[in-house]
Amino acid sequence: MSEEIVYANLKIQDPDKKEETQKSDKCGGKVSADASHSQQKTVLILILLCLLLFIGMGVLGGIFYTTLATEMIKSNQLQRAKEELQENVFLQLKHNLNSSKKIKNLSAMLQSTATQLCRELYSKEPEHKCKPCPKGSEWYKDSCYSQLNQYGTWQESVMACSARNASLLKVKNKDVLEFIKYKKLRYFWLALLPRKDRTQYPLSEKMFLSEESERSTDDIDKKYCGYIDRVNVYYTYCTDENNIICEETASKVQLESVLNGLPEDSR
C-alpha cells in the first residue's frame, strides 16, 4: 500500500517537472531567437555602414579626380596662354627691333644725303645756313676751322681757341693733314708738345701719335713750340707770336636747313 502511495507521488511530481522543463525550453528558445535576430540586425547595419562608407569614398574619389582633372586642364590652359603671351611679346620686340633698325638706317641715309646736299650748297655759298660750322669758319670733312684775325703766343693761342669751345689745330688724323696741305698754311701754331730744343721735320702721318700739348706747360717760356709752314713743322720760342687757327667738330647737318635752302624748282 505504501509503495503505491510513493509511486503516485513520483508520478505527480514528474508531470510538474516536465511542465517546468517545457516552460524552460520555451523561454530559452525564445531568448535564443531574440539574440540571433539582434545579431542579424547588427550585421546588416554594419554591412550597410560599410557599403555607405565605400560609396562615400567612391564619391569623394570621383570628386577628387574630377577636381584634379579640371585643375590640370586649367593649369595647361594657363601655361599655353603664358607661352603664347611670351611668344607674342618676343615677336613684338623683334618687330620693334627690326623697325628700330630700319628707322636708324633710314635716318642715317637721310643724314648722309642731307650732308652731301649741304656740301654742294656750301661749295656755291660758303655761308649757306645749312653749314654745320660757326660763321666765318671753314667746313672740311667732319671739322670746322676758324682762322683768327690776330697773333698770339702759343699759350695765348691755346686760350683763344678754348674761349671759342674749340682747340688749337692739331694733326690728329688724315683729314687734318689733308686740310693743312690743301690750305698751305704758313706760320700757324700747332697743338704739339713743347720741347726743350729747337728742331724741324716734314709734315707726316707720324704726327698722329704726338702727345697732347696740355700735358706739359710748366716753364713754357723756356721751351720751344711747333708751328706749321706749308709742309714742314718748325719749333720756335713759345713766347713768339704766330697766326692762330682753331678746330672743332662739325655739328650734324639739319635736313630742314637743307630743304629750305634748295631752289623752288628743285623741290
Swiss-Prot record:
Main location: membrane
Superkingdom in the source lineage: Eukaryota
Post-translational modification: Phosphorylated at Tyr-7 by SRC in the ITIM motif following ligand-binding, promoting recruitment of tyrosine-protein phosphatases PTPN6 and PTPN11.
Key word Heme present: no
Tissues in which the UniProt entry reports expression: Mainly expressed in lymphoid tissues. Preferentially expressed in peripheral blood leukocytes; less frequent in thymus, spleen, heart, brain and lung; and undetectable in other tissues.
Stored CDD domains: CLECT_NK_receptors_like (cd03593)
Single GO MF annotation: carbohydrate binding
Cytoplasmic side: 1-43
Mutant phenotype after disruption: Mice show hyperinflammatory response. Mice undergoing collagen antibody-induced arthritis show enhanced and non-resolving joint inflammation due to aberrant neutrophil function. Neutrophils exhibit significantly increased neutrophil extracellular traps (NETs) formation in vitro following monosodium urate stimulation. Following plasmodium infection, mice are protected from experimental cerebral malaria, accompanied by a decrease in the frequency of brain-sequestered granzyme B-expressing T-cells.
Protein's membrane topology: Single-pass type II membrane protein
Residues bearing the modification Phosphotyrosine: Y7
Residue spans crossing the bilayer: 44-64
Side of membrane Extracellular, spans: 65-267
GO BP: any one term: negative regulation of neutrophil activation
Keywords: Cell membrane, Disulfide bond, Glycoprotein, Lectin, Membrane, Phosphoprotein, Receptor, Signal-anchor, Transmembrane, Transmembrane helix
One GO cellular component term: cell surface
Motif ITIM motif: chain residues: 5-10
Location of the C-type lectin domain: 140-247
Glycan-linked positions: N98, N105, N165
Pfam families: Lectin_C
Cystines in this chain: C118-C130, C133-C144, C161-C246, C225-C238
Function: Myeloid inhibitory C-type lectin receptor that acts as a negative regulator of myeloid cell activation. Myeloid cell inhibition is required to limit proinflammatory pathways and protect against excessive inflammation. Specifically recognizes and binds various structures, such as neutrophil extracellular traps (NETs) or monosodium urate crystals. Also acts as a pattern-recognition receptor for pathogen-associated molecules, such as plasmodium hemozoin or mycobacterial micolic acid.
Subunit details: Homodimer; disulfide-linked. Interacts (when the ITIM motif is phosphorylated) with PTPN6 and PTPN11.
Annotated PANTHER family: C-TYPE LECTIN DOMAIN FAMILY 12 MEMBER A (PTHR47647:SF2), C-TYPE LECTIN DOMAIN FAMILY 12 MEMBER B (PTHR47647)
Domain notes: The immunoreceptor tyrosine-based inhibitor motif (ITIM) is involved in modulation of cellular responses. The phosphorylated ITIM motif can bind the SH2 domain of several SH2-containing protein phosphatases, such as PTPN6 and PTPN11.
Protein name: C-type lectin domain family 12 member A
The organism of origin for this protein: Mus musculus
Top-level taxonomy: Eukaryota, Metazoa, Chordata, Craniata, Vertebrata
Originating gene: Clec12a
